UniProtKB/Swiss-Prot annotation:
It comes from Cavia porcellus. This is ATP synthase F(0) complex subunit 8. The modification N6-acetyllysine is found at residues 54, 57. InterPro entries: ATP8_mammal (IPR039017), ATP8_metazoa (IPR001421). Component of the ATP synthase complex composed at least of ATP5F1A/subunit alpha, ATP5F1B/subunit beta, ATP5MC1/subunit c (homooctomer), MT-ATP6/subunit a, MT-ATP8/subunit 8, ATP5ME/subunit e, ATP5MF/subunit f, ATP5MG/subunit g, ATP5MK/subunit k, ATP5MJ/subunit j, ATP5F1C/subunit gamma, ATP5F1D/subunit delta, ATP5F1E/subunit epsilon, ATP5PF/subunit F6, ATP5PB/subunit b, ATP5PD/subunit d, ATP5PO/subunit OSCP. Keywords: Acetylation, ATP synthesis, CF(0), Hydrogen ion transport, Ion transport, Membrane, Mitochondrion, Transmembrane, Transmembrane helix, Transport.
Length: 67
C-alpha cells in the first residue's frame, strides 16, 4: 500500500487560508457603514384603554358560597 504524500499540504493549506482571508476582506470592504450614527429619540405614546378608567367587578367562582 503506497504512502500518502503530504509534502504539498502545507503550501495548499497556507494558500487556502490566505485566499479566504483576502476574499473575506474584499467582502467586508464592499459594505458601506454610516460614518456618524445619530441617536433616535424614542417617543412613548399613551394609549387610552377603556378598562383603565373604570373598575371591573371580580366575581367568585360558583362553587364558593359565602354566608
Amino acid at each position: 500500500m503506497p504512502q500518502l504524500d503530504t509534502s504539498t499540504w502545507f503550501t495548499v493549506i497556507l494558500s487556502m487560508i490566505i485566499s479566504l482571508f483576502m476574499l473575506l476582506q474584499l467582502k467586508i470592504s464592499s459594505h458601506s457603514f454610516y460614518l456618524d450614527p445619530k441617536t433616535m429619540s424614542l417617543k412613548t405614546t399613551k394609549h387610552n384603554l377603556p378598562w383603565e378608567n373604570k373598575w371591573t367587578k371580580t366575581y367568585l367562582p360558583l362553587s364558593l358560597h359565602l354566608h
